[in-house]
UniProtKB/Swiss-Prot annotation:
Name of the gene encoding the protein in the UniProt record: bcerS
The keyword GTP-binding is annotated on this UniProt entry: no
Pathway(s) it belongs to: Lipid metabolism; sphingolipid metabolism
UniProt key word Acyltransferase: yes
GO biological process: sphingolipid metabolic process
Alphabetical keyword list: Acyltransferase, Cytoplasm, Lipid metabolism, Transferase
Misc: The bacterial ceramide synthesis pathway operates in a different order from that in eukaryotes. Furthermore, phylogenetic analyses support the hypothesis that the bacterial and eukaryotic ceramide pathways evolved independently.
Protein name in UniProt: Bacterial ceramide synthase
Superkingdom, taxonomy of origin: Bacteria
GO cellular component: cytoplasm; membrane
Record function comment: Involved in de novo bacterial ceramide synthesis. Catalyzes the condensation of 3-oxosphinganine with an acyl-CoA to generate oxidized ceramides. Can use acyl-CoA substrates ranging from C8 to C24, with highest in vitro activity with C14 and very little activity with acyl-CoA thioesters of 18 carbons or longer. May have a preference for monounsaturated acyl-CoA substrates, as it has a threefold greater preference for C16:1-CoA over C16:0-CoA as a substrate in vitro.
Compartments reported by the entry: Cytoplasm
Predominant location: cytoplasm
Amino acid sequence: MPFDSTNADLSVIPVKTPAELKRFIALPARLNAKDPNWITPLFMERTDALTPKTNPFFDHAEVQLFLATRGGRDVGRISAQIDQLTPQPTEGRLDGHFGMIAAEDDPAVFNVLFRAAEDWLRARGRTHAVGPFNLSINEEVGLLVWGFDTPPMVLMGHDPVYAGPRVEEQGYAKAQDLFAYKADETGDIPEIAQRRVKRGLPSGVVLRQLDMSRYDQEVQTLTEILNDAWSDNWGFTPTTEAETRQLAKSLKQVIDQRLVWFSEIDGEAAGVVVFLPNVNEAIADLKGKLLPFGWAKLLWRLKVKGVKSARIPLMGVKKKFQTSQRGRMLPFWMMKASRDMAMSLGYNRYEISWVLEANKAMTHIAENVGGTHYKTYRVYEKAL
């Protein structure tokens, strides 16, 4: 049965059919059509992300998508999900998540969407709703609340100015803020770090690029490093082996092996930095479609013409090395190597994101390599 609101012609339906999923995916492009900074995600990629057979997130999570309709017209959407791998912050608290929020600027639409998602979570024993997560903390996270004047980088979201206030009207408050930093070729590592870099790597430290000939093994090494490095961060949820394989498959056509740098200490994998070409720069005019000619355009722009911007979505050093003198320098050595390579390949700007506001070590690194905070994404929470 549809979820009926007090507005007689406004209802919420659970997404059950391929046709309804198609409507769910298509809605944000229509809602944001007049926003010059909106970039429509690829429909094929979004379909895979929201289909249990192609997204291993569903192996450990329960998900329900909802569409809000008015008079036969789609006016909003939201997801509700429970990730069984999510650690609970305190005893007696059970978090459920919401995500994929997009709606017309109408309080009634936001109200019926959140009521549907909250009722679904409450019926499954959840005590709090946290989000947005699209769909997990290891994917797109947070609602854009500051920095609306530029397009989003690859795998980052973009939301209208009214979205944050509308969510807060539903009783949600800030749980965490996530920062995005911009940097260009004029930025560099701090002078004191530069002096150490110029002296060369100390004994036992090795920097190397991604080896595509053993790509799957390299992605497993990357996941091992990041699962360890991030394990004490707020909201940390480990990436599973199946998710690692899916990550490897999805990034293989996009990643540039020259822009992925591993570090080793005494023969052990210790850290990693990934510069990811900004695919959004290449798909901005494709309107989410790869057929009939979108694939050719995308590959030509990425592999031949090249894009000028990149994002650093992944950076970390294993905890056992973080307090040692060599370990503390690893981010700067890796950043220097990958940044210099990116600039030599024609990139002129990049984003470091997302960085937890509370992660002072990482905000310090971002600022000390020339990064300027220019976007804020907010994760909200509400007691149910």
